[in-house]
């Protein structure tokens, strides 16, 4: 029983590593938005929707990792 519990904790910890990648991805998306806007301010209205889409996709991968972690901890 203790081995199964330890495996759950290790699996949940490994699953949360994906949250770090999501945070880095979001930072890269908004850094690119700031860089593009500073180079050409007239493209702000064109670049912003793409940045929000990139943010949403990066955040979704992080939420999937968090969901898997919770399933490992509290699931069957």
UniProtKB/Swiss-Prot annotation:
Site residues, Reversibly protonated during proton transport: 59
Query: Where, per the database record, does this protein carry N-formylmethionine?
Result: 1
Example GO CC term: the record gives: mitochondrial inner membrane
* Keyword match Transmembrane: yes
Gene3D superfamilies, from UniProt?
F1F0 ATP synthase subunit C
InterPro entries for the chain: ATP_synth_F0_csu (IPR000454), ATP_synth_F0_csu_DDCD_BS (IPR020537), ATP_synth_F0_csu_sf (IPR038662), ATPase_proteolipid_c-like_dom (IPR002379), F/V-ATP_Csub_sf (IPR035921)
Which residues span the membrane? 14-34, 52-72
- From the UniProt record, give one GO term of the biological process aspect: proton motive force-driven ATP synthesis
User: Cross-referenced PROSITE patterns, in alphabetical order?
Assistant: ATPASE_C
Q: Which GO terms describe its molecular function?
A: lipid binding; proton transmembrane transporter activity
Cell compartment(s), UniProt: Mitochondrion inner membrane
Q: Name one Pfam family in it.
A: ATP-synt_C
Keyword Cytoplasm part of the UniProt annotation: no
Keywords for the protein's UniProt record, in alphabetical order: ATP synthesis, CF(0), Formylation, Hydrogen ion transport, Ion transport, Lipid-binding, Membrane, Mitochondrion, Mitochondrion inner membrane, Transmembrane, Transmembrane helix, Transport
* Membrane topology value: Multi-pass membrane protein
Q: How does it assemble?
A: F-type ATP synthases have 2 components, the catalytic core F(1) and the membrane-embedded component F(0), linked together by a central stalk and a peripheral stalk. The central stalk, also called rotor shaft, is often seen as part of F(1). The peripheral stalk is seen as part of F(0). F(0) contains the membrane channel next to the rotor. F-type ATP synthases form dimers but each monomer functions independently in ATP generation.
Task: Describe the function of this protein.
Answer: Mitochondrial membrane ATP synthase (F(1)F(0) ATP synthase or Complex V) produces ATP from ADP in the presence of a proton gradient across the membrane which is generated by electron transport complexes of the respiratory chain. F-type ATP synthases consist of two structural domains, F(1) - containing the extramembraneous catalytic core, and F(0) - containing the membrane proton channel, linked together by a central stalk and a peripheral stalk.
Annotated family: Belongs to the ATPase C chain family.
Q: Which PANTHER family match?
A: ATP SYNTHASE LIPID-BINDING PROTEIN, MITOCHONDRIAL, ATPASE PROTEIN 9
Q: What is this protein called?
A: ATP synthase subunit 9, mitochondrial
Q: Which organism is it from?
A: Pichia angusta
């Amino acid at each position: 029983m203790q081995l199964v519990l330890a495996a759950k904790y290790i699996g949940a910890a490994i699953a949360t590593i994906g949250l770090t990648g999501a945070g880095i991805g979001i930072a890269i998306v908004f850094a690119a938005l700031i860089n593009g806007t500073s180079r050409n301010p007239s493209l702000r209205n064109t670049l912003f929707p793409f940045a929000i889409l990139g943010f949403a996709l990066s955040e979704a991968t992080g939420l999937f990792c968090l969901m898997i972690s919770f399933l490992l901890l509290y699931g069957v």
